[in-house]
From Swiss-Prot:
Keywords: Cell membrane, Membrane, Transmembrane, Transmembrane helix
Organism per entry: Bacillus subtilis (strain 168)
Membrane topology according to the record: Multi-pass membrane protein
Cellular component terms per the entry's GO annotation: plasma membrane
Gene3D superfamilies noted in UniProt: 3.30.70.120
Bilayer-crossing regions: 18-38, 56-76, 83-103, 112-132, 165-185
Lineage of origin: Bacteria, Bacillati, Bacillota, Bacilli, Bacillales
Protein name per the record: UPF0750 membrane protein YdeO
Keyword match Transmembrane: yes
Length: 290
């Protein structure tokens, strides 16, 4: 009975994802063509290889981005699924078309290398992060890294770094050593922006707290942050004492306040903090600050 309604909702969500992936591709293309490439700064991954090929053989950048990414999109289809591959194709086509559209647009920044790498990295990272957040990708090298990590005794992040090392060596043959180093910096900034856009500024964190005053700690967290917490019975390996370990998941924006609460109640508390990829259930997103 609810099937037509669910189908309509899914269709609307898919259309929104497609629009956002297209916007992401266009933004990334703008960053490349108006900030990075005019100042001899490249990107990593397939886009970086495409930029090198474009400069060496005087071929349109958009065509190279589209062609070189084809096998990687196929890998994405095999590893992740049809929806991801479709959105990635849309994103890559948008990026490729965007580079052609903005190719003759004057550079918005020139001369200041620090500003170029920072602004270029931010624009590029925002575009790529927007695509990833909505289920697509603008560069295929990550898909290759995932496949290789299943065959080799290395993690995905290590392989991405290793593969990009070769990309930046190629970049140095076109843009020189300085251009390659600036490209590394821009790539690093872009990767951080991608993480922020994909996960959001308000990503979650888990605090594990061992304190002599667990009841007061939990009560204060509830009253001041509006957050619940759970107890877990733990046993000290050195002291052989039983104690209550508190686990509390908070919004990243609440981190400073929680640290203040912990410090006020028990300066000797043992605290472990780690990032959380996703939180579901209950009313976690509803803040109730006092």
């Amino acid at each position: 009975m609810n099937t037509p309604k669910k189908h309509k909702k899914f269709k609307a969500k898919m259309i929104l994802q497609i629009i956002m992936v297209i916007i992401g591709g266009i933004i990334a293309a703008y960053g490349l063509e108006t900030v990075l490439i005019p100042n001899s700064v490249s990107d990593g991954g397939v886009t970086g290889l495409s930029i090198v090929g474009s400069q060496l053989f005087n071929l349109p950048l958009g065509i190279l981005i589209a062609v070189i990414n084809i096998p990687f999109v196929w890998l994405g289809y095999k590893q992740i699924g049809k929806s991801f591959a479709l959105l990635s194709i849309i994103g890559i086509v948008s990026l490729a078309a965007g580079t052609s559209f903005f190719h003759h647009t004057p550079a918005i920044i020139e001369g200041d290398t620090l500003l170029i790498t920072v602004v270029g990295g931010i624009i590029l990272g925002f575009g790529m992060g927007l695509a990833l957040r909505n289920g697509g990708a603008l560069d295929g090298i990550d898909m290759l890294a995932v496949l290789l990590s299943r065959k080799l005794p290395f993690g995905t992040s290590d392989l991405i770094l290793f593969l990009n090392l070769f990309v930046f060596i190629f970049v140095s043959t076109v843009f020189g050593l300085q251009g390659a180093l600036l490209s590394v910096i821009a790539y690093y900034i872009a990767s951080k922006v991608i993480h922020v856009v994909e996960e959001g500024l308000s990503g979650s964190k888990t605090f594990q707290i061992i304190t002599t005053q667990p009841e007061l700690m939990v009560e204060t967290i509830r009253d001041q942050l509006g957050r619940s917490a759970t107890y877990k019975e733990a046993y000290g390996g050195f002291s052989h004492e039983k104690f209550k370990e508190i686990t509390c998941v908070i919004n990243r924006l609440e981190e400073t306040k929680l640290k203040e609460i912990i410090n006020d109640i028990d300066k000797t508390a043992f605290v472990t903090v780690y990032d959380v990829a996703e939180v579901k259930g209950s009313n976690f997103r509803n803040l109730n600050h006092h």
